[in-house]
Amino acid sequence: MDPTQLRSAAAEHRYLRGLIQVPVGLLFIVAALGNEHWGPLDNDWVFVAVLVLLAGVAWAVNRFYDEHYGRVTPAADREAKAIGMGLLGAALLFGLALLLRSRADWSLDLPVNPIPGVFGLTMLAYSAAVVTLRPHHIVIWGSLAVAGLLPVWSGDDPSNIGLVMCGVAVMANGVFDHLTIVRTLGPATLPTDG
C-alpha cells in the first residue's frame, strides 16, 4: 500500500469499524419492540438488561478491532466534524420527525415515516462529510430515506416500523463498512508474541 493510500485508510479507520454497528442496529430493533410492549421487552428492566448486553457486545467488537487492526486517533478537525454532524443529525431527526408527522398541533401530518426518511438522509450526509461516500452508503441510506419519505404511510403511527428499518440499515451498513476495512487493510491479524 502506498503512503497516500495508507494515510487515507488510517484516517477513515475509526469510522469503518463496521461490526460495531451491528449491536447499534439491534438496539434500534429492541427499542421498537419495547415500544410495542412485545413479550419480555414489556418490562423496562429487560430493556435495560438488553442495553447493557449490547453495550458489552459493542465493547468486545471494538476490542477486536483494536487488537487486530490497531488503534488510530482521528485528526481533531475530523473528529469535530463527526461530532458536529452527529449533533446536527440528532437535532434534525428530532425536529423534522415532529414537523413531518406527530401529534403536535403544528405538525404537517404527512403520510410519511419520518424516522427512516430523515435518518437515511442524515446518515448519507454524515457518510459524505465524515467518511468517504461509498456505493453501499448511497444504496443503503438512500433506500432508507426513499422508503421513509414515500407518501404511503397513512394510518397508525409507523415510528416503530421506522426504527426496525433503521436498525436493519445500520447493521447492513456495518457489514459493508467492515468489508471495506478488510479489503483496504487485509483480514484480521493475530497478535504476535514477543
Q: Which positions does each model-derived feature cover?
A:
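N-terminal juxtamembrane cytosolic/stromal segments of multi-pass membrane proteins
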Residues: 1-20
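Membrane-proximal helix-loop-helix units in multi-pass membrane proteins
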Residues: 87-147
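Hydrophobic alpha-helical transmembrane segments of polytopic
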Residues: 17-27, 47-51, 119, 162, ...
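Selected alpha-helical membrane-embedding segments in polytopic membrane proteins
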Residues: 21-101
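Helical transmembrane-bundle signal
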Residues: 25-31, 54-55, 91-94, 123-126, ...
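Membrane-helix interface and helix-disruption motif detector
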Residues: 36-48, 98-115, 152-165
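Alpha-helical transmembrane segments and their membrane-interface exit regions
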Residues: 52-60, 117-128, 166-179
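Terminal transmembrane helical module of multi-pass membrane proteins
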Residues: 128-194
